[in-house]
Design a protein with these regions (language model features):
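Phosphate/pyrophosphate- and phosphate-bearing ligand-binding catalytic cores of soluble enzymes
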Residues: 85-173
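N-terminal short leaders/motifs
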Residues: 33-40, 63, 68-70, 106
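Short, well-ordered alpha-helical segments in soluble proteins
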Residues: 42, 60, 64-68, 83-86, ...
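A gly/ser-rich beta-alpha-beta helix-loop segment of oxidoreductase catalytic cores
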Residues: 44-45, 49-80, 150, 156
Length: 173
């Protein structure tokens, strides 16, 4: 037991690692699905709007928790609803319109365990979607180390104070 952490760690795995197409523009994803895997599934089904996920390391559940995003897109832009369990064990579905999203956070209780989510894409051209994913990957490679293991981004951009990205502010200091 870890005496430094007063809580429970839950790892959702195999049973929460499924993706399915509900109809021509809606995807349902388990919370353990890797963000990039969801973007590739959307590509195979000619759905645009998920391209940015190809550049985000992490899972769907984590992405929803922090409203992860990059290149001007965030989870809130594609989320229809999230299915969760509250601390009493009740399963609930929360429509995205009932969630207050902000930069890298939302107002959902930290006690919720996200199980799955539904997302809406837009029918698109496979080649254009793939090209956009490639373009975003190249842009990320120019601005971030992608060939070595890192802890990822540890800073939030101070959007209320400046238009500059935090890495630029650090470099300039």
């Amino acid at each position: 037991p870890d005496k430094l952490f007063d809580g429970v760690v839950i790892k959702l795995s195999k049973n929460f690692n499924n993706i399915s197409l509900l109809n021509e523009d809606i995807i349902i994803s388990g919370s353990a699905v890797i963000d990039k895997t969801l973007s590739e599934f959307a590509l195979k089904n000619n759905l645009s709007g998920f391209e940015f996920l190809s550049c985000i390391p992490g899972t769907i559940g984590g992405g929803i928790r922090m409203n992860a995003g990059c290149f001007g897109r965030e989870f809130k832009d594609i989320l229809i609803s999230v299915q969760a369990i509250d601390k009493s064990g009740n399963m609930i579905t929360i429509p995205s319109k009932d969630i207050k999203f902000e930069y890298r956070k939302n107002d959902l209780s930290g006690d919720f365990i996200f199980l799955s989510a539904s997302f809406r894409g837009k029918k698109g051209d496979y080649a254009k979607i793939k090209n956009e994913m490639h373009k975003l990957k190249k842009e990320k490679e120019i601005n971030q180390p992608t060939k070595i293991k890192t802890s990822g981004s540890t800073f939030k951009n101070p959007i209320s104070q400046t238009e500059k990205k935090v890495w630029k502010l650090i470099k300039e200091s």
